[in-house]
Amino acid sequence: MAKSAEVKLAIFGRAGVGKSAIVVRFLTKRFIWEYDPTLESTYRHQATIDDEVVSMEILDTAGQEDTIQREGHMRWGEGFVLVYDITDRGSFEEVLPLKNILDEVKKPKNVTLILVGNKADLDHSRQVSTEEGEKLATELACAFYECSACTGEGNITEVFYELCREVRRRRMVQGKTRRRSSTTHVKQAINKMLTKISS
């Protein structure tokens, strides 16, 4: 059997937006009511995505980490889930600054991410419209999902699967670019040698 592809995913957002609940819903298909928001956890999960076995390492960040810790998590990850709570406008407004930090940390690479509006079951308390989420996702050039870790509404599994697909696509593009670049260097070296020989 072929070795499984390994993907490192990290989930970011303000404390209380439901990051842990989203991860637990994805892994267990259940909702757990109580979490310690100061805990950071890493989970391993294997899944078959598009006929390929993928081993995910998922970092559930605490949401209250200091700058050095957060930047270390950003350097570690290959794909990112940025989460806000649709009932908390402040959490939505923190997404763009978070993306800017990600861009700075991952420079010059483009960041692979997905935007998630959580707590869609609390529509009666909504402070961020679906359209605003879609608009921000367009600005960030990423996919957007609204879901509820509590009820399972929306497709949380698809969030993680789509992020894995994006990471794999990005790797393939970077691999081709690297191969093209090294082929060009070899051709240039051969041309230099041939020029010296003929002169």
Swiss-Prot record:
Residues reported in the UniProt entry to bind GTP: 13-20, 60-64, 118-121
EC code(s) of this entry: 3.6.5.2
Reactions the enzyme catalyzes: GTP + H2O = GDP + phosphate + H(+)
GO BP terms: negative regulation of cell growth; negative regulation of cell population proliferation; response to hormone
GO molecular function annotations of the record: G protein activity; GTP binding
Alphabetized PROSITE patterns for the sequence: RAS
Keyword RNA-binding in record: no
Keywords of this entry: Cytoplasm, GTP-binding, Hydrolase, Nucleotide-binding, Proto-oncogene
Top-level enzyme category: hydrolase
Family annotation (InterPro entries): P-loop_NTPase, Ras-related_GTPase, Small_GTP-bd, Small_GTPase
Protein family membership: Belongs to the small GTPase superfamily. Ras family.
Protein name (record): Ras-related and estrogen-regulated growth inhibitor
